[in-house]
Amino acid sequence: MLLCIDCGNTNTVFSIWDGESWLCTMRTSTHHSRTADAYFTWFSTLLGHYGIDPQIDDVIISSTVPRVVFNLRVFCDRFFNLRPLVVGKPDCALPMEPRVDFGTGVGPDRLANAVGAFARHGGDCVVVDFGTATNFDVVAEDGAYVGGVIAPGVNLSLEALALGAAALPHVDITKPDAVIGTNTVACIQSGVFWGYVGLIEGITTRIKAEYGKPMKVIGTGGLAPLFAQGEVLFDTVEDDLTMYGLTVIHKYNKDKNPS
């Protein structure tokens, strides 16, 4: 079985793929100092809760936090005797080549999203990923990643507002019943929710106009279902797109190097 690890700035997700479907998905907060032993304790405890004892044959990692990769490598080596495939490293081949400015690095999560989107839907699409940042990733007709947009994430915006404005509280994001708020919390929720609806609509409209061809819009990330409620922002929402992209990248590398 394949263990897929997606480490972002806020959360780290472990998912186990049996070749056809996900056995389980586990999420924890990202900590730079978390040790390999701590990862194993957390991982094995949750596996016991799920009542499964999978045979992990391979591991693939996508991480936007370089400092965490070392401890994840130690975790894989110590407890599975495996050398993980790390997206973005020279020994990890991609089924497509990014067409971006020379010397520009592309986040491994964005590459995985592009690969997953192309595998499921073909090209000419834009992936909107709600993470610490809100990313818009454009996938060309041939599957190449050709660029995108990075905007502040929803929760990051809420935190910045609470930190920067002494009189404003930190609130949780939800879809307001109305645009006009009648109390401070409702006003903040309305501003952030409807502000991001406008952001998504505006940026995807401009991307489509600049691209010059019809495009599918795919939502992913933890908050995508919230923003899809009653709004025509996405053609589809897929909460496992990044992880699915990792399975495609892993298979591509195994097919290239079957040994």
UniProtKB/Swiss-Prot annotation:
Manner of cofactor binding, per the entry note: A monovalent cation. Ammonium or potassium.
Location within or outside the cell: Cytoplasm
Residues annotated as signal peptide: none
Residues given in the record as ATP binding sites: 6-13, 132
Annotated substrate binding sites: 107-110, 184
GO-annotated cellular components: cytoplasm
GO molecular function: ATP binding; metal ion binding; pantothenate kinase activity
InterPro entries cross-referenced by the UniProt entry: ATPase_NBD (IPR043129), Type_III_PanK (IPR004619)
EC class name: transferase
Taxonomic superkingdom: Bacteria
GO process terms (BP): coenzyme A biosynthetic process
Record: residues binding K(+): 129
Listed cofactors: NH4(+); K(+)
Catalysis performed (reactions): (R)-pantothenate + ATP = (R)-4'-phosphopantothenate + ADP + H(+)
E.C. code: 2.7.1.33
Active-site residues, Swiss-Prot/TrEMBL: 109 (proton acceptor)
Keyword Zinc appears in the UniProt entry: no
Function noted in UniProt: Catalyzes the phosphorylation of pantothenate (Pan), the first step in CoA biosynthesis.
Summary of subunit composition and partner proteins: Homodimer.
PANTHER family (alphabetical): TYPE III PANTOTHENATE KINASE
Similarity annotation: Belongs to the type III pantothenate kinase family.
Name assigned to this protein: Type III pantothenate kinase
